[in-house]
Amino acid sequence: MRLLRAVVLPGLGAIALLAAAGWAVRLLGGDDPREDRTVRAFQNAFGHRSDEHAGATDSAEPTRPREVIDRVTEPLSCYSGVPQTIANGAVWCGVTWLLARDRRSAIAPAAVLALETACFVASAALVGRPRPEGVWRPEPPHATSSFPSGHTAAAFALHGTLADLLERHGARRARLLGRLLRYGVPSAIAFSRVYRGQHHISDTVAGAALGRWSAAVVRAELLP
């Protein structure tokens, strides 16, 4: 009953809220919203051509990094990929167990990714938002819905939980490092996903909300 009340029912509520938000965003802005104009303009400022015609989402220009921002966002986007995130979570489960010898703490990284992923997959399937149109996109997109951003959600969820673990176990400089993990790294990943044409801005906002919520649930249940 505790799991049902503390995790399952709130998770269903989160899925419903995300789906409603996604439908509203699509209804109000369509599948080529005004927010994408900002992304196109920003990409153009760094020398990446964009095509205003619907469906022309992948530029024919070379995908090698040319600007500093390209060289920075490429590894960030790669770091937040699905296999990398799963491996990252598994590694931190092991590291936490070795350092803390606390089962609840050790499963926290896996638990937060499981919760975030379940909510992401369900809400994305319900929303079905297409990826941005007419943008520079150096890597092929995933087949899942653009809303919410799963990479962003996972980044905020996992790194938020890592920050909570540092604070719970009294690590040195936990406050400073915790802020970097909780806000800095995930925000940089969210930016990279938008800049590289993988998501609408609103996708990453929703992903950040999902990730923060997932971390809060795990903190309350496993890291009180």
Placement of each model-derived feature along the sequence:
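N-terminal transmembrane-helix/juxtamembrane module of multi-pass inner/ER membrane proteins
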Residues: 1-84, 88, 125-140
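Alpha-helical transmembrane segments of integral membrane proteins
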Residues: 2-14, 104-112, 177-181, 202-203
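Alpha-helical transmembrane spans of integral membrane proteins, capturing the lipid-embedded, hydrophobic core
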Residues: 11, 15, 89, 109, ...
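Short hydrophobic alpha-helical membrane-entry/anchor segments
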Residues: 19-32, 97-103, 121-130, 191-199, ...
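Hydrophobic, membrane-inserted alpha-helices
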Residues: 68-74, 89-95, 160, 184-190
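Interfacial segments of alpha-helical transmembrane regions
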Residues: 94-118
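Small-polar-interrupted transmembrane alpha-helices in polytopic inner-membrane proteins
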Residues: 110-129, 177-191
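Membrane-embedded catalytic cores of phosphoryl/pyrophosphoryl-handling enzymes
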Residues: 135-224
